[in-house]
Amino acid sequence: VAAADRARAVELLEANGYTVAILAQPDYRNVEEFRQFGQPKLGFLVSAGAMDSMVSNYTANNKPRSEDAYAHGGVAGHRPDRATNIYVQKIREAYKGVNVLIGGIEASLRRTSHYDYWTNTVKRSILLDSKADLLMYGMGEHSLLEIAALLREGIPARQIRNVRGTCWYTSRKE
């Protein structure tokens, strides 16, 4: 999430009595990076950052970018392709059964089936590919506080279905 957006989300959560730890641009190859703060009480909130990771990593000509404007020192190569998916995968490896919510620009833009420029295919929702429990899209401050309150009550993220600005899994029967 962009610094201002991240600060706003953290500010809102902390003002409402929640404790927040930020793991900014972790080494996605090392699962221990995701264990450094311990298992959270409510869950993980995952964002690829201020920009879609594929746009951040590649030019329109599909060439790797030499700089990353949103990485420390502007150095490219610290953010994986499809960062939301990779981060959720590492969290699932580190902690089985923990609530994982995704949001930010990458999740918002890929919440439904979408054309993927880099593979020239139509891909399904990032919620399905990432295996997160819940997707928040758009400006998520209000939904974030509502979801945090539900998680605090003990409702698993996969069962939250009444919050505006979210996407969730459903079966064909539903």
Task: State each model region's role.
Residues 8-19:
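Short helix-loop-beta junction
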